Amino acid sequence: MALKIVDKFRKKSDKDQYLVALDIGTEYVKALIGRVVDNQVEIIGVGRQHQRLTDMQSGAVTDIAGVVDNCDAALRQAEEMAGVVGKDTVMGIAGELVKGTATTIKYKRTDAQSRIEMPELRNILDRVQDRAFERARETLAWETGQQEIDVKMVNTAIVDVQIDGYRVTNPIGFQGRDVTIQLFNAFAPMVHIGALQQVANNLDLNTINIAAEPFAVAKSVGGEDTADFSAIFID
């Protein structure tokens, strides 16, 4: 009966926009189906499935086939509740091998009278990300004992920008000499990311984003207009 309900609404999901959120935890897989309404997501389906001890370790997938079965069970629960099938998914990534780092760079502009444009800002951000990438790679290499470990950035966000000591939310168009930018980046090993992508492929889902879960939680609570917001999250 559940499959008939899903099939009945399958065509509807082609007209409306739905998103699937998958949180593949060490103990449980959690699945959400949401309807996109005015740039917000209305949750219409929820499901979860217990994982075996051999499926995950420290937040990382160790048995792709086992995790696929668990995700499928959680998705069926969410689909039955929602009455629709989503195809686009956002997957959470966590665990001890996901590294988040805040990097600060300070530099003096040669022409303080010129206005900051996008190419200049992009060059600064690239330098910050390169520095953060090497730091994350060195940390993961030390922790895993693998010197040639492939790492990929999963999230990035500007935390703070100051020009001549003056805090701004968008540096484009400003003049000044001393620029300080703090950038948060989250990195994860490619083997970890590749396992999640394979899980999504086996479930016939289109992965639109893989997000670092601690970053996603802070982003959803903090918002865009709360530069002075700070909090401690306890799981």
Predicted regions and their residues:
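Active-site cofactor/substrate anionic-group-binding motifs, chiefly glycine-
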Residues: 235
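Nucleotide/phosphate-binding catalytic cleft detector across ATP-hydrolyzing
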Residues: 1-28, 32-89, 93-232
